[in-house]
C-alpha cells in the first residue's frame, strides 16, 4: 500500500447555459387535427366535435352511409413542405380547400397513415380538409357494445368496421396558440393552434412552435467560458 497522500480533487465548476437557443435546420413539425365538423350531405355541417365524441354519437345513432369529415385549421404563413397524414377509414376522397388530393405513399411515422402532399393547396387564413368516408358498423359491433349478456371476451376482441380518427399535418412550419399554465408544475394547456413560420430563436420549445413535435430537433447556443482551469 502506498503511503502517499491522494491529491485533493478540485471542485467542479458549474457552467450555466443561457435560456435562448438557435434552431439548426428546418425540422419537420406536426399539428394534430382532432376536432371535426361532420355532414351527411356535404352541405350542412355540425358544430366541431372531438373525434371520439363524434364516434360515440355515430355508434349510438347507428348511422350508416356517406359521411363528410371536415377538419379546420388556420395558417398565418404558408409552409414550403406540408403533408396530411390520415388513416384509411373506408376513405372515398380527400379534398383541401375544395381541391382533390391523392395519396402519396404511407407515413414513415406509422405505416397505417396515408400521406397526401397538401402544401400547394393551402392558403393564408382558414383552411379546411374534407375526408369523405363510407361509414358503417356490423351488427356484431352493436351487439358487443349494447347487447345483453355480452362476455368480456367478445368486448375485448371488438374490432370496428369504421373508425373516426384525428389526422395530422407534418411539414416545415411552427405551431402557435394560446397557452396557460396547468394545475401541475411543467404542465401547459394550449388551444386555438395555428400554423406559422418557424422561429429561428427559441426559449420555450412548446410555446414557441412545437407543442406536438415528435422526433429529433437540434438547438445550439454560444457559451462564453472565462476560466478553463
Predicted region positions:
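An acidic-aromatic loop/edge-strand motif
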Residues: 1-63, 122-222
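Short beta-strands within extracellular/lumenal beta-sheet-rich domains
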Residues: 61-75, 112-116, 213-227
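Generic beta-strand/beta-sheet core signal
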Residues: 85-87, 97, 104, 132-134, ...
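A glycine-anchored, Pro-Gly-centered beta-turn/N-cap motif
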Residues: 80, 118, 123-125
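Aromatic-lined ligand-binding clefts that engage carbohydrates, nucleic acids, or primary amines
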Residues: 73-98, 129, 223-225, 229
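Extracellular structured ligand-interaction cores
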Residues: 68-70, 81, 89-91, 113, ...
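Solvent-exposed beta-strand/loop surfaces of large extracellular or lumenal domains
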Residues: 89, 94-116
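Short acidic, gly/pro-rich beta-turn/loop elements at beta-sheet edges
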Residues: 81, 94, 104, 139-141, ...
Amino acid at each position: 500500500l502506498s503511503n502517499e497522500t491522494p491529491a485533493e480533487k478540485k471542485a467542479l465548476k458549474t457552467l450555466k447555459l443561457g435560456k435562448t437557443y438557435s434552431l439548426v435546420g428546418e425540422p419537420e413539425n406536426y399539428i394534430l387535427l382532432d376536432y371535426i365538423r361532420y355532414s351527411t350531405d356535404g352541405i350542412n355541417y355540425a358544430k366541431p366535435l372531438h373525434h371520439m365524441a363524434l364516434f360515440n354519437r355515430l355508434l349510438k345513432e347507428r348511422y350508416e352511409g356517406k359521411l363528410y369529415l371536415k377538419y379546420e385549421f388556420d395558417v398565418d404563413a404558408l409552409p414550403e413542405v406540408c403533408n396530411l397524414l390520415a388513416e384509411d377509414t373506408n376513405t372515398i376522397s380527400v379534398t383541401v380547400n375544395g381541391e382533390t388530393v391523392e395519396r402519396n405513399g404511407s407515413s414513415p411515422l406509422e405505416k397505417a397513415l396515408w400521406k397526401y402532399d397538401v402544401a400547394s393547396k393551402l392558403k393564408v387564413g382558414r383552411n379546411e380538409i374534407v375526408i369523405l368516408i363510407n361509414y358503417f358498423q356490423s351488427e356484431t359491433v352493436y351487439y358487443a357494445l349494447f347487447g345483453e349478456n355480452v362476455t368480456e371476451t367478445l368486448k375485448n376482441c371488438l374490432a370496428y368496421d369504421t373508425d373516426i380518427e384525428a389526422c395530422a399535418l407534418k411539414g416545415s412550419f411552427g405551431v402557435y396558440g394560446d397557452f396557460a399554465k396547468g394545475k401541475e408544475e411543467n404542465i401547459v394547456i394550449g388551444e386555438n393552434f395555428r400554423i406559422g413560420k418557424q422561429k429561428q430563436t427559441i426559449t420555450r420549445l412548446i410555446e414557441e412552435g412545437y407543442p406536438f413535435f415528435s422526433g429529433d430537433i437540434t438547438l445550439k447556443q454560444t457559451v462564453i467560458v472565462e476560466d478553463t482551469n
